[in-house]
Amino acid sequence: MEKMMPGMVKEEWPPSSPEEGEAPRPMEGLHEVGPPPFLTKTFDLVADPATDGVVSWGRAGSSFVVWDPHVFAAVFLPRFFKHNNFSSFVRQLNTYGFRKIDPDRWEFANDGFLRGQRHLLKMIKRRRPLSYLPGSQQALGTCLEVGQFGLDEEIDRLKRDKNILLAEVVKLRHKQQSTKANMRAMEERLQHAEQKQVQMMGFLARAMQNPDFFHQLIHQQDKMKGLEDTFSKKRTRSIDIVPFLNPGEVSQGDQLESTLLFDPRPFAELNDEPAKSELENLALNIQGLGKGKQDVNRTRNQPRNQASNETELTDDFWEELLNEGARDDAGIPGMERRRPRYVDALAQKLGYLSNSSQK
């Protein structure tokens, strides 16, 4: 340490410039916050010409496009971001305000992410989560939640309407099934009627080709009328002769009379089966008279409904009826063997030209 001589005064030179006398200041931009590393890495990755086949700038330079997401996730994400999840990269872009501008490809844009303008990256701010919102914004969110009560009522009303519509659909479906069942039953009845009509037309055609059939028919009707007269006389005679019985006793004649008096034909309309036409009844009566050469009493005691069920108007029935008529023709005197011309014309119109004897 230097000792000052007596009488000597230390002189201080003034600063050469006014800046040297001011307090020191930090370097310009020292406290400025730079862009996040995620944005800088993404900018460098997009701007690198070596990666244009995988990721590059858009045509206008205001967006970037990921052309191959698989290669981008497998090669570049582990190198720059230490992971290989492309969905995580997209979510990270969303947190910084990037938006997807093309639905057909992975093209993203941001107002601060432009080609050749790296300094604009500091303008891009990360979105804050909802937990960091100020009190006023949280209050606004609460108000919005309170306003959703009206939407809940609307949703409940729509659910009720949906349930009503579903019940209506189920009801209509049941009606549709019942309608289909009725239509199927109607189709079966129509087919049965058409089949019966075809059989009747065939019977008529074959009958018209046989000129002796009508003479046989008249002869059979006369037989039937005689049998009915005989049967009615016997019934009247049994009613006139009534034996004396004690109270509560029933004679065999009464039992037989009750069986004979009960005729189910007036109740045929109450059955589900369709009533037979006059021609069918006539054919059945002719067939019954042909077989009436057997025991008459056994036929009388047999129930009517059983006889009707056993006799069906099938093709075999008509064939047997005509063959039986042809056999009975030998015993009828004065029968013509010639076929009239109108019979042939009618048979040709009906389309059945084959004779029953040829079959």
Swiss-Prot record:
In Pfam terms, one family for this protein is: HSF_DNA-bind
Pinpoint motif Nuclear localization signal by residue range.
233-237
* Coiled-coil intervals, chain numbering: 150-202
**Where in the cell?**
Cytoplasm; Nucleus
Motif AHA: where? 315-324
Q: Does the keyword RNA-binding apply?
A: no
Chief localization: cytoplasm
Keyword match Ribosomal protein: no
Q: Where is this region: Disordered?
A: 1-30, 290-314
InterPro entries in UniProt: HSF_DNA-bd, WH-like_DNA-bd_sf, WH_DNA-bd_sf
Position of motif Nuclear export signal? 279-286
Q: Which region ranges are annotated with the description Hydrophobic repeat HR-A/B?
A: 158-208
**GO annotations of cellular component type:** cytoplasm; nucleus
Regions of compositional bias (Polar residues) in chain numbering: 299-311
This entry's comment on induction and repression of expression is: By heat stress.
Compositional bias per record (Basic and acidic residues), positions renumbered to this chain:
1-13
Any idea which GO molecular function terms this record carries? DNA-binding transcription factor activity; sequence-specific DNA binding
What keywords appear on the UniProt entry?
Coiled coil, Cytoplasm, DNA-binding, Nucleus, Phosphoprotein, Stress response, Transcription, Transcription regulation
**GO biological process assignments:** cellular response to heat; regulation of transcription by RNA polymerase II
Q: What is known of its domains?
A: The hydrophobic-rich region (HR-A/B) corresponds to the oligomerization domain. AHA motifs are transcriptional activator elements.
Purpose:
Transcriptional regulator that specifically binds DNA of heat shock promoter elements (HSE).
Task: State the family named in the UniProt similarity comment for this chain.
Answer: Belongs to the HSF family. Class A subfamily.
Subunit and partners = Homotrimer.
PANTHER family reported in the protein's UniProt record: E2F_DP FAMILY WINGED-HELIX DNA-BINDING DOMAIN-CONTAINING PROTEIN-RELATED, HEAT SHOCK TRANSCRIPTION FACTOR
What is the protein's name according to its record? Heat stress transcription factor A-2d
List the taxonomic lineage. Answer: Eukaryota, Viridiplantae, Streptophyta, Embryophyta, Tracheophyta
